[in-house]
Amino acid sequence: MEPSNYYSDQDVEKCVTVGETVLSDHPDIDLIICPDSTALPGQLEAAQKKDLTKDDVTITGFATPNAIKPYCEAGALYNWGLWDCKVQGALGCYLAYYLASGNDVAVGDVIDVPGMGLVEILPNDCLVPGAPTAEVNNGVVLLPERIIFTAENVDDYDF
């Protein structure tokens, strides 16, 4: 599959259309990993329009639990993920405090975040090697965990 043919530009309506195209162009497809939080509900909507369930094609990606809950309840997918907003907020606040306290950071540094553990400052291009950035390797921190949502735990979250 050529990815540029199926990207929906994070446009909600286009996501459904792109999802329908993927399913039509590849009727024997077994797995679809959606690239963004609008693509996942769009792809699931497209699958439902074709009366497909998680037993017909595995669809997953990242999106909020509230956006995907109806599809989960309908049996359209097994699981999906997203970063934990509380962990993301806590990490961002602590790193802001850490920097405001006069600490400098550089790629390769490891910071002990209370209640979270060690996080490392990674090069900007750690996810996409060679990707252009405004400053070379000024650093990023990846979240240490993500939430995996399932039919069993989706009701535990409201966002």
Predicted features along the sequence, with ranges:
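A residue-level marker of the well-folded mature domains of exported/periplasmic proteins
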Residues: 1-159
